[in-house]
Swiss-Prot record:
Assigned protein family: Belongs to the eIF-5A family.
Disulfide bonds: none
Residues modified to Hypusine: 37
Protein's recorded name: Translation initiation factor 5A
Source organism of this protein record: Methanocaldococcus jannaschii (strain ATCC 43067 / DSM 2661 / JAL-1 / JCM 10045 / NBRC 100440)
Gene3D superfamilies recorded: 2.30.30.30, Nucleic acid-binding proteins
Cellular compartment(s): Cytoplasm
PANTHER family, sorted: TRANSLATION INITIATION FACTOR 5A FAMILY MEMBER
Keywords in alphabetical order: Cytoplasm, Hypusine, Initiation factor, Protein biosynthesis
Molecular-function annotations in GO: ribosome binding; RNA binding; translation elongation factor activity; translation initiation factor activity
Membrane-spanning parts: none
């Protein structure tokens, strides 16, 4: 899958990101259990989707590999606000994006700056940096 890399399940920590069922998620809980005398430890990983806020989980041996999304944090300038959508321009590449305004984001105004993330082809505004 493009935009991801593989890591061992045993090296994951709370607060990191992981792909669960093809959805990039932030890890909120990890529990490791050793089943007995024979057999490897298993990890139960619980995550919340970055973009949909859906709770997902999986169980896997700690020695197995799992996909981790490559998260790219960028800055953009607000060009226009159109109802529940906002048009922003990336300050490095100058590409224009139309993104939904997430809940809890206040203070958006044309000319202001925002921070947004990009992961596996999806975008989300994370915070307002400043105004004009």
């Amino acid at each position: 899958m493009p935009g991801t890399k593989q890591v061992n399940v045993g090296s994951l920590k709370v607060g990191q990101y992981v792909m669960i069922d093809g959805v990039p998620c932030e890890i909120v809980d990890i529990s490791v259990s050793k089943p007995g005398k024979h057999g490897g430890a298993k990890a139960r990983v619980v995550g919340i989707g970055i973009f949909e806020k859906v709770k997902k989980e999986f169980v896997a041996p700690t020695s197995s590999k799992v996909e981790v999304p490559i998260i790219d944090r960028r800055k953009g300038q607000v060009l226009a606000i159109m109802g529940d959508m906002v048009q922003i321009m990336d300050l490095q590449t100058y590409e224009t994006l139309e993104l939904p305004i997430p809940e809890g984001i206040e203070g958006l105004e044309p000319g202001g700056e925002v921070e947004y993330i990009e992961a596996v082809g999806q975008y989300k505004i994370t915070r307002v940096i400043g105004g004009k």
